[in-house]
């Protein structure tokens, strides 16, 4: 797995749409785990020394550290609940993120002007990535990155990833790249406002303000660094990621997929049209058909810039969410074709009603604030299980119906 694929994995596991199994990942006792971890730390010094890490930095990095059981737990298990594309996009492209994205668009206008001029990456896409990765900096991760990566590195299926990124993180410390205090990030080692892994920090992070530091914990330098990353992956300046389209009856699943890419002029000749009826602006551009929920849901022709977004995270649903959130921040509307399963964003009134209904039924969710977080989703899963329906923890109008039907 190359460094770019590792970036995709590390950012993917950090997304809040996934819910992980709450099972113990320790196959041995904590004492045995600590002993094995300490042995790894001692033996890994040889690799760190070879990579140019000083003994002083190495000892400071590992002082007092033990393996992180939560990291082992998450690394050992795949997500228990996987949202279908419709629910993923609805959960990702929220009114709150759209409004906040537009506020950031105004707040950082001059900086975004300069970033877009230099790297050519659409500012709305950069803001969408920021919103998707850390909700505009509100949750950048509170894990000690050295502890997380060394925990991944000493055992488990991501040991190679953990060790390579651990060396990169130690190099960051050696170069004084980290703000005061421990290096903090996600459990998989992604850091800063736009969640770069250490190796990609070393390759792509930029010093935007010229102070001699590449500070991805600063919003502007994180946005500039992600712009540099996307530009180096082949971002096509001045072009979009794709189009929502209307399909003629004869074009269906047999035409979909990346291997069936063709020019927009050939798609038009087949009768595929943009929603709204406008012509495709560059008939020679190549695109492939993506049907996230089959022929009954929205259909998209995806261009090269969509593939570039996927260099950040390889999931189609992630890249579609980034593209759609970017369009909404720009002022665009939601998809015209409805999702076949009825997935849609809840109104504020509905969110409060779900929380109040769950409390009335005896579920513990914490404060009623209209934010459907971890506790609310856990309560929804219990409600779904009780009612014998698919358990995914996703808040929909059907949850309100379920609450109203219960005695």
What feature does the model see in each segment?
Residues 2-17:
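Bacterial N-terminal signal peptides that target proteins for export
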Residues 11, 285-300, 348-356:
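Short glycine/proline-rich, acidic loop/turn segments that cap or connect secondary-structure elements
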Residues 28-33, 334-336:
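Proline-rich, low-complexity linker regions of envelope-associated factors in Gram-negative bacteria
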Residues 35-63:
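Mature N-terminal segment immediately following signal peptide/propeptide cleavage
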Residues 40-47, 111, 148, 354, ...:
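A general alpha-helix detector
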Residues 53-284, 297-302, 306-326, 331-348, ...:
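Catalytic glycan-binding domains that act on GlcNAc-containing polysaccharides
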Residues 346-351, 359-403:
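Short acidic, glycine/serine/threonine-rich helix-capping segments at coil-helix boundaries
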